[in-house]
Every structure is written in C-alpha cells, then in structure tokens.
A protein has these predicted regions:
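Mobile cap/lid helix-loop segments that gate and shape the active-site cleft of serine hydrolases
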Residues: 32, 48, 190-229
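Catalytic histidine-centered segment of alpha/beta-hydrolase-like enzymes
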Residues: 276-286
Length: 301
C-alpha cells in the first residue's frame, strides 16, 4: 500500500470514531485529492452554453457524517466576466477536507436578474439527477466571491419566500451561506461605482448590471435583487468576509445587513478585514477558511 492510502485510512478511522469537526479533519495533499476525487467537468444544467458546472465527488464524503455538506460555489466578475476555472482557489480548502463540491458557471453579460436565476436552476438539476451523484442536498452550503456571493446570498434568503421565482425543488435545503465580498444591500451604490469608472470594462459592467434600464436603475427595481430585502430570522446562517478597503462593493453597503447578522452572533459570523481589498490575499484567504470551518462546525446545523 502507498503512503497516501495509509493516510486516507487513518483519516477515515478518525472520522468514524467521533463527532466530526471539519476544523480538525486532516487536509488531504494535492496528490491525494487528485487520486481520490471523481471529477466531471462542464456538466450542462441548462440549455445555454454558459449553464455548466464541474462536479467534484469524494468517495469519503459520507465519513463526514453530519458535516457532509454539498458545497456549491459561484465565481465573481461583475456578472460580466470570469469563469469557474479562474477561481478554483476558493474550492481547494473544501476538496482538502474530502467534501463534495460543485463549481458552477452562470450566464454573464446579460444582467443581474438573469444571472441570479441560474443557481436555482443548477440546484434543481442536481436534485433531479441525484441518483447519479448521491449528494446530500439537505445540507447545501452556497458560496461565492463577489457577484457569485451575491447570487448565493439572494437564493438563500428567498428560498423560504413563497412569492419568489424561480423556486427551489423540494428536497433541497440551503444549510448555510459563505459570502466573500458579495453585495447584500446597496446595489445602487455598486452600480454607480462601476458606471462612473473610467476603465472601459468596469463601466461596461455597470451598464450591463440592469439591461432593462437605460440609465441608473430605480431603487424600487434594484431592491428586488438585494438580499437584505428578504432577510428574516428563518434564513440560514451567514458567514461574510468583508474588506475594509473594497473599492468595488464599498463597506457602506454591508452595514445594515451586518447589523442584522450580528443580532444573532450564535448563528452568524462576520470577518471584517480593515485593510482588505475586494479580493482577499492568499494569507487572508487561509485565515478566512480557518474561520469558515469553525463556522460550519459550530453554527451550521
């Protein structure tokens, strides 16, 4: 037997002997991740060419017992650029723990309203096809960076709103949200940040956020896409990472939402990094994931 295999056996024995705490699960090496995961790239969950996802299925995920979460990650890019392959650093910590991970694309350059639908479509696809994947869809953690984190947050807080469409299929429960720099309020502020930018691609992002309007979108329209509009005590636990020097999603846009989260510190976690930019550095990301696994251990049921 190889050394890697012995390590996996030892990890499995430890997991089987006690209540699992993700923070204490030994990290697999990159070689172990590559050797053990069943990876399927570019699975179509819709008819549009951008509606694809990557599946990372772990043969040892069931050993995580009550912490066998299904992680669904969405990339950033202002709903306009980027791709799931460009932000894999956000899923690596979960893979090292042996968790099942879905890394998804969504429709870009067509505005916030269309992009926000695709997470629901992807989750419903996973539910309809779960005989092939064997995911625990009663323990879904939706997560993302920037635009992707906004989408994750919006779907999480609207899941219990009977009037919101599209709807999640039965048999899906969002157990928690991990949001890196994603708008939760003040989308009008974010729109102005981008539309007033002298960099052409940044301005293009701002113009494309709400293509139904020709100028700045009215606040009453934007409010439909702000997670704070739907926030209530029945929403899943939130973990938010926020940079104090974020020049794309300004800290002021988080203030009201964070205040709501902090009313229940036993449930929610906010990691504010005063010197943090929009995108966390490698060191900031490592620190964040230490806190995220403790959040998943202690605050997510």
């Amino acid at each position: 037997m190889t050394k890697n295999f012995y390590c996996l056996l030892l990890g499995g024995a430890l997991l089987g002997s006690c209540t699992v705490q993700l923070a204490g699960v030994p990290n697999q090496t990159p070689a172990q991740v590559q050797a053990t995961y069943r990876v399927t790239k570019d699975v179509a969950y819709g008819t549009d060419k951008e509606q694809t996802l990557d599946m990372y299925l772990s043969p040892t995920a069931n050993r995580l017992k009550q912490k066998n979460y299904t992680i669904v990650f969405l990339h950033g890019g202002g709903y306009y650029v980027s791709d799931k392959a460009r932000e894999e650093r956000y899923i690596q910590p979960y893979l090292k723990k042996g968790m099942n991970v879905v890394n998804m694309n969504y429709r870009i350059k067509r505005g916030v309203p269309l992009a926000t639908e695709d997470l629901t479509y992807a989750l419903n696809f996973l539910r309809a096809n779960n005989a092939a994947y064997h995911l625990d869809l009663n323990r879904v953690i939706v997560t993302g960076f920037s635009a992707g984190a906004h989408i994750a947050s919006l779907v999480a807080v609207t899941a219990n709103d009977p009037a919101y469409s599209p709807k999640l299929a039965s048999g899906i429960k969002i157990a928690g949200v991990v949001n890196f720099s994603g708008p939760v309020d003040g989308l009008d502020v974010v729109e102005k940040v981008f539309m007033s930018n002298d960099v052409l691609v940044m301005k293009a992002i701002g113009v494309a956020l709400f293509p139904e309007t020709t100028d700045y979108a009215p606040k009453e329209y934007i409010r439909k896409y702000e997670p704070i509009t739907y926030f209530d005590k029945n929403d899943p636990p939130f973990f938010i990472w926020q940079g104090g020097k974020d020049d794309q999603v300004p800290p002021v846009t988080f203030e009201k939402f964070v205040a709501l989260l902090q009313q229940n510190p036993q449930k929610n976690e906010v990691l504010f990094v005063p010197e943090g930019q929009h995108s966390p550095s490698a060191a900031e990301l490592a620190t964040a994931y230490q806190a995220i696994f403790e959040f998943l251990d202690k605050k997510v049921k």
